[in-house]
């Protein structure tokens, strides 16, 4: 039995614990009851909570336990199965401050009065004597990023701690069990601070350098050492010191400059005798402090270059895969040699690396560039720690070119588990699925950023459109819960949201934050509820959703909304600039009003589930008015066409619930005719992409989607593959970013409507099987590790026979839809000939 608390293994938590557990794979016996016990000792002699419940529930089970701060709790769960068998598991979790006060103070090193972009990274240190503790926990607030060391060893194996938030509203602190890192007697702790997004000095269109939270990097730290009798704390305060270190420059959108001549041997160990200066107290940011309950960023894959060649300025190393991360490079030159390492994901027509196309928004300092200066003639290794880059190509200039074997690229991502698989008989479709995955993991760096190169910011529309496939494919529940808090923190009291979140203050005005780009407040909580079955996510976001609906209503005229970004990045000719990327066919009022209607209908759905009956009736009435206004203004009922006469507009009427049930078959036929007229090419941008593939998949025309995506001529995703894509592109013509996830909603389509597997009830307690047997595919399969176990659906055509393969987890049911026939299944594995 695997037990998770708040969807994590043995976590530190600050919130009400949610318990989830799995039964052994292949055991389809129903759970009759469970016994859950929580104690403060491993022998379960000091029990603080115990309950037995006769239920099959085992996902996000909330228990009202009076938890103490800074405490380790042991958990035992015994699941009683209907056949008489019992399955037992044990685990533990630890609490942080639980909202309590910190005794430590914020400190920094260097000139604490200046927000100077070229200040080196801050190296803080403290030596102390201690007995060997029974348990030791290190709590760190490190702004913007930090890396902690104890006795010369790095604490943890993650990168880019602390997560990006609106630092004036919410700061996420970290907790580490460091018991084994402390020695009896003399010890030392060192912390390196980088700028991150907290002290982001980039002059860019998004006002990052004028963020209301911006300040010098700072540290607040408490080390709690627990002994047999009593505890001891080490706090960040005026007794700390700082040293000058080798990271001379660091910027999240720029890179890192490292001069090994400034290394201070032993600075993070006891007995250091080099020069030190007193640390300084600095201003408390004043935000609430929350424990990071989320998978950290780690190295998830490593790649060696597949090619090395000479360029005009140096040597270029090519990877087989476009990634986001860092390069670990060993330099073999002479002492004093200075190397410049530049990263890009594209080449110019002459084969030289293109370092400028995506640097257009960065108006100061370098872009995607690291610099390393050697201190000796011996080999020296380096990787940046306070930035990451998006790249497939690494250009090294200066000194002696490092050998090919001396470069290794490390892909970084929040280290959540992959929970789903998809494959089919069309290798082009499989490659498109890979593009979706590769782009998604490249952009998961504590938020789902729009891209890994140009901006590293989370555009709300992009994230909202990708969230469903992200949550299907990965256990990214905590990442999206965190981002929902970011959304709530960014919302103004009247319901206005920015189009990038977290935002430094940009994106609240103009035609940037319409119902389309603010839709994540509507859909993402529902995606979380669908995938993981926790009603609390709807409750947490309900007030904000209501405010958002009120704001859209205030911006509408006669229940028609028209103030968003629209169907961004539909096919266009020319460079990837805003005037081209916004040249879409779908009228803005059509898409915005469709999203307005969805927001109101979802508010009604939330209200009914949460028991707010009066609200539900209010939103039902408002939805009827929006629907009536849309139909009157945009729908030609006689010809069954939608204003705009394009794929996106037609699909949106169906997808957003603006069509009556009896009209849907004819609208799907209209959509099919438009696609045929367009030569089986997509004419949609990212809004239309999701609406079109969902509509066609739901109503039995997945074949048209596959034909469009795999069309050998422009525009299509097949053309991206022919252009060498290993990640999704931003624009159909290959312009803009070469690693952007915003078209990745097609992955959810593959799972739900090609292989045919989707959740019909929260947490997959009910499953829906809709395999696309009518396509030319000879097989397709999908599986997902649901909260109740593995679910799967697939089909195989062989020797004139078609067999559908199903897996229904214990305590779940499923319905198989083949044409007009519906068959029901209980838990088990099935092979059904159709």
Sequence positions of predicted segments:
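Extracellular/oxidizing-compartment recognition motifs
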Residues: 1-72, 76-454, 462, 478-481, ...
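Alpha-helical support elements that line or immediately flank enzyme active sites
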Residues: 136-140, 150, 326-345, 383-386, ...
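Non-transmembrane amphipathic alpha-helical segments
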Residues: 525, 597-600, 604
